[in-house]
A protein has these predicted regions:
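A nucleotide- and high-energy phosphate-metabolite-utilizing enzyme signature
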Residues: 1-195
């Protein structure tokens, strides 16, 4: 508690990074009662730290989905894997980060991204169809990512990257729509925190 409290009171870059990692804790062994009590305390404490939440929201908006203005894919400058998309960094991370902040802001104690999104949807008056579309977008990107990893040697470089031209037309279309759902979720986050 003391460490989490310190991060909430002094939201500097290192504290924000630590929070994005450690606030997703889960019990590994034994009685869940201790972790449940810590999670309940944390959810309440974070809601009393609006500056911390706002800075976490700003951080969550730093990693944008790789869509250009005309909804074409936007590629990073990775020389080892040109014209590929990093599905972890630019695909799942926007969902995970936004879901974490929205869950903390709305008192949702879940640690899984899908459960957080559904919990926030119930509390924050997000339409059920909107939440379902966001969850489906996240799920599709995760599916592509896991399929890619399964097709490669364990530990191989580029396991989270995909060449969209290697996808069939339908999967490319769904991937664009999925990135659009990440963008929509980030827009909600920006609106909620006036960023």
């Amino acid at each position: 508690r003391a460490r989490f409290s310190r991060w909430l009171r002094t939201p500097e870059p290192k504290a924000l990074l630590n929070a994005s990692i450690f606030f997703d804790f889960r019990p590994l062994y034994g009685d869940d009662e201790l972790s449940d009590a810590l999670r309940t305390w944390l959810v309440d404490a974070v809601r009393e730290a609006p500056l911390f939440l706002r800075l976490m929201a700003a951080n969550a908006l730093q990693c944008r989905p790789p869509l250009g203005l005309l909804r074409d894919f936007r590629f990073d400058r990775n020389e080892a894997f040109p014209r590929t998309l990093d599905l972890k960094l630019y695909g799942t991370r926007p969902f995970v980060d936004a879901a974490r902040v929205l869950a903390l802001a709305n008192g949702v104690a879940h640690t899984g991204t899908v459960q957080r999104l559904r919990g926030v949807g119930e509390i924050a008056r997000m339409g059920g169809d909107d939440v379902a579309a966001i969850v489906d977008g996240f799920g599709f990107i995760q599916l592509l990512r896991l399929q890619r990893q399964r097709s490669m040697q364990p530990g191989a470089a580029g396991a989270n990257r995909i060449d969209p031209d290697a996808l069939n037309e339908l999967d490319r279309h769904i991937l664009k729509k999925s990135f659009g759902q990440a963008r929509k979720l980030q827009s909600r986050l920006a609106l909620d925190f006036r960023l």
